[in-house]
């Protein structure tokens, strides 16, 4: 007898319990702070990690100055505020409502385009752009090369960056996706015909934003797609993306050949009205490209790509997505929905990486990008997939060559095919590499990839792996301020400030639990060793002793501001 129904009921009950008792998450020794903009409506959230004093002074009798707190980018909104009252039935505060209404009155008078790209091209710095500049800098006014609102505007105007902010999703806190900004991470959630419920997907949304998701895609293919998306949007502080062809397929009872432009158009309008911030559109899958996949090991692995390929073959013509692309752009322009041009022919195995089908589609995506820009629609380009390490840079080079600087957004890529259950690791290797080469956003992969629908714990594992990859890429790019947290951690580690080490970690709970498995006593939180080396073999403790023995080896242990270092 199958246990699936009972497991599904249990998962739903657990999710309902989580949401009914939902309160802001407490990060150890952290506080939620705000940076004010030029008007009172611009309040940029961030998390401040407070640090303790240095316990073991390098020079007897000489007290070092206090360790400054570390400010970090925060996507958790009220879900990271222990003092917040949260009601998922009421939804989040509409932080952008006033900005949208003010612009609506102006646009009615002058008949201007309403997208962030349209404003940027007119030389207008929107509140969203100012918000983003403050957010990227984390209030570090002393940076050598800080991000300015004008820089944000110029990057958007050039098409090198996008601000996905549907005017019908006022709950979202503005963020930017572009190669000259912090590398962002997307988390995929969504139900299937086999598993999950609305409650579970909202739970995953909350969980993903707590662990740092910059955007979330609702890839629901099961029941209640509209209702699931509505709950997600009203409770999401981050941009929400979708693949509209999934809901369109549901409308025609799963028969790809019965899809049509009228059906798809209705879905686009419905989702845009709800507030979806970006659409993945697989308009680059052309009829002639399908035969290029015939000799692939894994064929067409994109769900949207395979659906459109089947439609093209059945009707022996180009897809309605390609034929009606300008109509799609007109809808997006009305709501400021960004386009994520899907890589329907991405490689699904190492053997298929960088093949003719993949790059043929990429060139078409570059052509579609220019068409979208004619309508002031913001665009990013989706990328692979499964790519071995030595072929990753070619993907970035080809995207820059053919897509006119539009941001690149990749799924990994996975660097080997041999590790089911660990594909969050195989893929974050490739993600870190392509992020360092200039990829703007990384789509996370969970341990369940190729195996099943991710649960809440899988979402966490995927997010942690990809926040590591994104941060490593930011360090490699020399992003202003990126190294501040690393240097604070290194200093805490050298000074045996264990509590600070836990609190500075991406996952403080796990860091603490690993330490406490062998040294749980409070006294061990000030000890000059851990269980790896013990008191006699700790290299850092010995290094302190060397400095005491030989004054010439003493150095100023005050860490230089890594924010300035990263900008040089």
UniProtKB/Swiss-Prot annotation:
Keyword Zinc applies: yes
GO terms for biological process, alphabetical: thiamine biosynthetic process; thiamine diphosphate biosynthetic process
Catalytic reaction equation(s): 5-amino-1-(5-phospho-beta-D-ribosyl)imidazole + S-adenosyl-L-methionine = 4-amino-2-methyl-5-(phosphooxymethyl)pyrimidine + CO + 5'-deoxyadenosine + formate + L-methionine + 3 H(+)
Main EC class the enzyme belongs to: lyase
Binding-site residues, [4Fe-4S] cluster: 530, 533, 538
Free-text comment on the cofactor: Binds 1 [4Fe-4S] cluster per subunit. The cluster is coordinated with 3 cysteines and an exchangeable S-adenosyl-L-methionine.
Subunit structure comment from the entry: Homodimer.
Name of this chain's protein: Phosphomethylpyrimidine synthase
